[in-house]
From Swiss-Prot:
Assembly, per entry: Tetramer of two alpha and two beta subunits.
InterPro entries assigned to the protein according to its UniProt record, in alphabetical order: DALR_anticod-bd, Gly-tRNA-synth_bsu, Gly-tRNA-synth_heterodimer
Organism of this sequence: Escherichia coli O8 (strain IAI1)
GO molecular function, one term: glycine-tRNA ligase activity
SUPFAM superfamilies, sorted: HD-domain/PDEase-like
Family recorded in the similarity comment: Belongs to the class-II aminoacyl-tRNA synthetase family.
Name of the protein in question: Glycine--tRNA ligase beta subunit
Length: 689
């Protein structure tokens, strides 16, 4: 069977840059699934994506599906015919489904009985006939949140479509895709190369598009070229380009023929906090800032043009003229904001609603101020500085700079606080209160910042849960999942002595009578413990290890983490599996007994050598391990408890627990309860698989 290269290119108007990669990857995944489901043999499925096109190139695509033999077993002969030998309705229905009559069916006979049988040789359908529907189906399944309609057509797609190229080898596959008749026509760059040309063979793609159309269709190639050229451009001016992955991806999705150029701005703008300048360059203009080796921002930026110009200086000058007013605005806002103290913005917070039922940003500020001070006292941070940071925490939201450049909230509070002469840890806390903003983000760097960051997040959690608006499904408008995980990360990774129980109770108390959910404290804690589950799963811990610790519901995050590490280590011990099984057995025995047990084991009632030995070791370990539990040395405790494997195994081998003698039975149950309690001081080991 011969094989050919298949090409599909959808020529469109400019596609959404932030969605370009996902559209292309989904197109490739969908089409690969179509090929596999159809049983079509194929080689590599390569995707291409540029601002005005999505394309796939499939190597070694078979010309047809393989022929196949099919067998369909019908009703048993006893049910297929009536007493007169006439076909039953069941038999006739089965035959119609196979496209035959009952008398055309074969018989299948085995030692288990006899049935009607349909056998057929099915010839594989040609690839050419299958491709149009496969392409259309793959496009219809793309993750497009909002479809467009254009012209008088009822066709919907992410952007208007102008060309559809379908080539199997050198042959055009006739089809109408997204309202466009397929052809071998491809459009090139808007301003360079040939605006439109024909492609003779699928194998010519994407090289022909580069040569004749001046378009680099390979997304990864464009991205790599931009990165390499930008690094070289920065090196030439003695700096390092800020090539963040997200911006690099976006710029690669905006250009078809990337040309990297270097421009500059006036040095006077460097007096403005670099974060505001960078926000303008990266967020608004899609420029790459350049830093000196000491980390200071240079008065230069790198940008990517979508054209090779005979006069690149004209393009450079144009971009410099575009960015200058934005930088001038930042300079003006910075100078204007500093004419008054940060604290002077407090009254204006009363005019901004935090949440309708929970009050204004000023109300939130007062709660954060009190909660940050309370947290600071618990963790040994400067209480005065923490309350001061809480008071100023939202003031920068009222500044001109943050109003215009919203992503500078926090960092501008830090700069304005420094200008006002606030303590350095207070200023830093204003910037770091929102950390961690995402997975892997840095944590607050000092105790005051930790107190403020936790206070801000806990106030939001308590408030939103307190009015019954907890996250449902994928919806989380107040980013409560991120807030909860942020609190847990700070407490665990900074090893802070905080208890979620008292922390949540204090956050709830500060709301007064505004909250309507009577179970808010438990709801918040359960939600946060649920975040622990997701966190530790991401860290590679097994689900049953997490469940074993969650079963004890430890509300001190640092303590929770210590238990997780202890149980994970315990699982590596030789005795772990046997003791987990024994704990499960003990748990089941105790659950089935409704008898009232004693507080302690009666040594005089012990009878068998195995129970005497086990009881003695339980008593010894109980006394020995008490300091371990008090100090949170759970790993050491479980290592010691692992020594119980032999006496526990011997006990269950030789001793019957549920004997008729009530005194003996209760004493043995009590001993098992004391044994289980030792393990439960760490986790429910019986849940380990």
């Amino acid at each position: 069977m011969s094989e050919k290269t298949f090409l599909v290119e959808i020529g469109t108007e400019e596609l959404p840059p932030k969605a370009l990669r996902s559209l292309a990857e989904s197109f490739a995944a969908n089409f690969t699934a179509e090929l596999d489901n159809a049983g079509l043999a194929h080689g590599t499925v390569q995707w291409f994506a540029a601002p005005r096109r999505l394309a796939l190139k499939v190597a070694n695509l078979a010309e047809a599906q393989p022929d196949r033999e099919i067998e369909k077993r019908g009703p048993a002969i006893a049910q297929a015919f009536d007493a007169e030998g006439k076909p039953s309705k069941a038999a006739e229905g089965w035959a119609r489904g196979c496209g035959i009559t009952v008398d055309q069916a074969e018989r299948l006979t085995s030692d288990k009985g006899e049935w009607l049988l349909y056998r057929a040789h099915v010839k594989g359908e040609s690839t050419e006939a299958l491709l149009p529907n496969m392409v259309a189906t793959s496009l219809a399944k793309l993750p497009i949140p909002k479809l467009m309609r254009w012209g008088a057509s009822d066709v919907h797609f992410v952007r208007p479509v102008h060309t559809v190229t379908l080539l199997l080898g050198d042959k055009v596959i006739p089809a109408t895709i997204l309202g466009i008749q397929s052809d071998r026509v491809i459009r090139g760059h808007r301003f360079m190369g040939e605006p439109e040309f024909t492609i003779d063979n699928a194998d010519q793609y994407p090289e022909i598009l580069r040569e004749r159309g001046k378009v680099i269709a390979d997304y990864e190639e464009r991205k790599a070229k931009i990165k390499a050229d930008a690094e070289e451009a920065a090196r030439k001016i003695g700096g390092n380009a800020d090539l963040s992955e997200s911006l690099l991806e976006e710029v690669a999705s905006l250009v078809e023929w990337p040309v990297v150029l270097t421009a500059k701005f006036e040095e006077k703008f460097l007096a403005v906090p670099s974060e505001a300048l960078v926000y303008t360059m990266k967020g608004d203009q899609k420029y790459f800032p350049v830093y000196a080796n000491d980390g200071k921002l240079l008065p230069n930026f790198i940008f990517v043009a979508n054209i090779e110009s005979k006069d690149p200086q004209q393009i450079i000058s144009g971009n410099e003229k575009v960015v200058r007013p934005r930088l001038a605005d930042a300079e003006f806002f910075f100078n204007t904001d500093r004419k008054k103290r940060l604290e002077d913005n407090l009254p204006r917070l009363q005019t901004v609603l935090f949440q309708q039922q929970l009050g204004t940003l000023r109300d939130k500020t007062d709660r954060i101020q009190a909660l940050a001070g309370w947290i600071a006292e618990q963790i040994g941070a400067d209480v005065n500085h923490a309350t001061r940071a809480g008071l100023l925490s939202k003031c920068d939201l009222m500044t001109n700079m943050v109003f215009e450049f919203t992503d500078t909230q926090g960092v501008m509070g830090m700069h304005y606080a420094r200008h006002d002469g606030e303590a350095e840890d207070v200023a830093v806390a204003l910037n770091e209160q929102y950390q961690p903003r995402f997975a892997g983000d840095d944590l607050p760097s000092n105790p005051v910042a930790c107190a403020l960051a936790i206070a801000d997040k806990m106030d939001t959690l308590a408030g939103i849960f307190g009015i019954g608006q907890h996250p449902k499904g994928d919806k989380d408008p107040f980013a409560l999942r991120r807030a909860a995980l942020g609190v847990l990360r700070i407490i665990v990774e900074k090893n802070l002595n905080l208890d979620l129980q008292t922390l949540t109770e204090e956050a709830v108390r500060l709301y007064g009578d505004k909250l309507t959910n009577a179970n808010v404290v438990d709801d918040v804690i359960d939600f946060m413990l649920g975040r622990f589950r997701a966190w530790y799963q991401d860290e590679g811990y097994t689900v049953d290890t997490i469940q074993a610790v969650l079963a004890r519901r430890p509300t001190r995050p640092a303590d929770f983490d210590a238990r997780m590490k202890a149980v994970s280590h315990f699982r590596t011990l030789d005795a772990a599996a046997a003791l987990a099984a024994a704990n499960k057995r003990v748990s089941n025995i105790l659950a089935k007994s409704d008898e009232v047990l004693s507080d302690r084991v009666n040594a005089s009632t012990l009878k068998e050598p195995e129970e005497i030995k086990l009881a003695m070791q339980v008593v010894v370990l109980r006394d020995k391990l008490e300091p371990y539990f008090a100090e949170g040395r759970y790993q050491d405790a479980l290592v010691e408890l692992a020594e119980l494997r032999e006496p526990v195994d011997a006990f269950f081998d030789k001793v019957m627990v549920m004997v008729d003698d009530k005194e003996l039975r209760l004493n043995r149950l009590t001993m098992l309860e004391k044994l289980r309690e030792l393990f439960l001081r760490v986790a429910d080991i019986s849940l380990l698989q």
